[in-house]
A protein has these predicted regions:
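The alpha-helix within a helix-turn-helix
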Residues: 90-94, 121-124
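DNA major-groove recognition helix of helix-turn-helix/homeodomain DNA-binding modules
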Residues: 115-133
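N-terminal positioning helix adjacent to the helix-turn-helix/winged-helix DNA-binding module
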Residues: 69-73, 98, 116
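Recognition helix of helix-turn-helix/homeodomain-like DNA-binding domains
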Residues: 98-113
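A short, Lys/Arg-rich alpha-helix, primarily the initiator
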Residues: 63-90, 130-134
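Residue-level detection of the helix-turn-helix DNA-binding "recognition helix"
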Residues: 33, 107-108, 125
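N-terminal cysteine/histidine-rich coordination modules
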Residues: 1-62
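Short, charged recognition helix plus adjacent turn
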Residues: 3-5, 9-11, 135-145
Length: 145
């Protein structure tokens, strides 16, 4: 978990975990967020303790507490790509994301997940573009799914 963790950066709907006996509790974001919950927070969403195994080995709600590198913004992503490839890559990204999400990603309104960054890099490679895609900026955040 980041040392400068800000509880208020988590979505209000983020489910907390109360299972302190879980074998993976020290690595689970849901448990770590629960431990850092401010007393001013009157109500939170929690995972039903009866729904998960007590050891947490096969927990479907587990989220790794290590932040990953998200990209933000694609305004200049295609600037150094040949025009013929630009048109094809842009069309493929819109087909992948959908028009609304594509433009939200371009305008820094939505973070671009690591898997999505890999997909875009694959589009570049398939068009013969050897340069690594450069997004507007990068930010460490937790992969919430």
């Amino acid at each position: 978990m980041k040392t400068d963790f800000d509880y208020n950066s988590m979505p209000v709907s983020f489910a907390h975990c109360l299972n302190g006996h879980c074998l993976r509790a020290d690595k689970c974001l849901r448990r770590q967020v629960t431990l850092r919950m401010p007393k001013e927070r009157a109500a939170v969403m929690v995972i039903n303790p009866e729904h998960v195994t007590s050891d947490g080995v096969d927990c479907t709600y587990f989220i790794d507490e290590k932040p990953v590198l998200f990209a933000r913004g694609m305004k200049h992503l295609l600037d150094r790509v040949p025009l013929a490839d630009t048109t094809v890559i842009k069309r493929q990204m819109i087909a992948y994301f959908g028009k609304t999400i594509y433009y939200r990603c371009c305008n820094k309104e939505r973070l671009i997940k690591p898997k999505e960054q890999e997909y875009i890099q694959g589009l570049f490679r398939r068009r013969g573009v050897t340069e690594t895609p450069q997004f507007d900026e990068y930010i460490e955040y937790y992969d919430l799914g």
